[in-house]
Amino acid sequence: IVAVLHSSEGVAGTITFIADSQIPLTGPNSI
């Protein structure tokens, strides 16, 4: 779900999403 927001940043955003998957709401690229 949050991955959609990260998709705008491309692959880098997706990788960050995976790294922040445990804390997606607290991640630097969450919202």
Curated annotation (Swiss-Prot):
Source organism, top-level taxon: Eukaryota
EC number of the protein: 1.15.1.1
Listed GO MF terms: metal ion binding; superoxide dismutase activity
Cofactor binding description: Binds 1 copper ion per subunit. Binds 1 zinc ion per subunit.
Substrates-to-products reaction catalysed: 2 superoxide + 2 H(+) = H2O2 + O2
Chief localisation class: cytoplasm
Disulfide cysteine pairs (residue numbers): none
Signal peptide interval: none
Co-factor requirement: Cu cation; Zn(2+)
Keyword RNA-binding part of the UniProt annotation: no
Subcellular location per the Swiss-Prot or TrEMBL entry: Cytoplasm
Gene Ontology CC terms, in alphabetical order: cytoplasm
Coiled-coil positions: none
Keywords assigned by UniProt, alphabetized: Antioxidant, Copper, Cytoplasm, Metal-binding, Oxidoreductase, Zinc
Function: Destroys radicals which are normally produced within the cells and which are toxic to biological systems.
Family to which the UniProt record says this protein belongs: Belongs to the Cu-Zn superoxide dismutase family.
Protein name, entry field: Superoxide dismutase [Cu-Zn]
